[in-house]
């Protein structure tokens, strides 16, 4: 009976050691934000194309698409009011606030479909 308990303890220990590392990085990554990158030329959130958000870690493609589709904005607070943003996405926008400018929206100059897909293939 003692040997059976010893084997059972070893099996449980091996399973814990095998599966424990799988869960820890996932939890740690979910709580962390990508590093903030300072841009020399800020992004004009009202007139930029989707691909410009590739410069900012964590934005491209999902958050970038949300921001492009919901433009124009008057301020950072307007960006944070987008329906459906997660707390992590809001934190990412706030952390990168210095990389955004709110230029006057040029309606007709950049149609939404062209701001999302400029046809760069290859």
Swiss-Prot record:
Domain of life: Bacteria
Pfam families: PsbU
Gene Ontology biological process terms from the UniProt entry: photosynthesis; photosystem II stabilization
Gene Ontology CC annotations of this record: extrinsic component of membrane; photosystem II oxygen evolving complex; plasma membrane-derived thylakoid membrane
Topology term for the membrane: Peripheral membrane protein
First and last residue of the signal peptide: 1-30
Name of the protein: Photosystem II extrinsic protein U
Subunit text: PSII is composed of 1 copy each of membrane proteins PsbA, PsbB, PsbC, PsbD, PsbE, PsbF, PsbH, PsbI, PsbJ, PsbK, PsbL, PsbM, PsbT, PsbX, PsbY, PsbZ, Psb30/Ycf12, peripheral proteins PsbO, CyanoQ (PsbQ), PsbU, PsbV and a large number of cofactors. It forms dimeric complexes.
UniProt entry keywords in alphabetical sequence: Electron transport, Membrane, Photosynthesis, Photosystem II, Signal, Thylakoid, Transport
HAMAP family the record matches: PSII_PsbU
Species name: Synechococcus sp. (strain JA-2-3B'a(2-13))
Family the UniProt entry places it in: Belongs to the PsbU family.
Function statement: One of the extrinsic, lumenal subunits of photosystem II (PSII). PSII is a light-driven water plastoquinone oxidoreductase, using light energy to abstract electrons from H(2)O, generating a proton gradient subsequently used for ATP formation. The extrinsic proteins stabilize the structure of photosystem II oxygen-evolving complex (OEC), the ion environment of oxygen evolution and protect the OEC against heat-induced inactivation.
NCBIfam families: PRK02515.1
Subcellular location: Cellular thylakoid membrane
Main location: membrane
């Amino acid at each position: 009976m003692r040997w059976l308990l010893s084997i059972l303890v070893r099996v449980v220990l091996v399973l814990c050691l095998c599966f424990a590392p799988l869960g820890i990085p996932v939890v740690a990554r979910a709580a962390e934000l990508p590093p903030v990158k300072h841009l020399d030329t800020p992004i004009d959130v009202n007139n930029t194309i989707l691909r410009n958000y590739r410069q900012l870690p964590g934005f491209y493609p999902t958050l970038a698409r949300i921001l492009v589709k919901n433009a124009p904005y008057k301020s950072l607070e307007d960006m944070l009011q987008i329906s459906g943003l997660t707390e992590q996405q809001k934190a990412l926008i706030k952390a990168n606030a210095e990389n955004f400018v709110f230029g006057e929206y040029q309606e007709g100059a950049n149609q939404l479909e062209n701001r999302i897909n400029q046809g760069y293939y290859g």
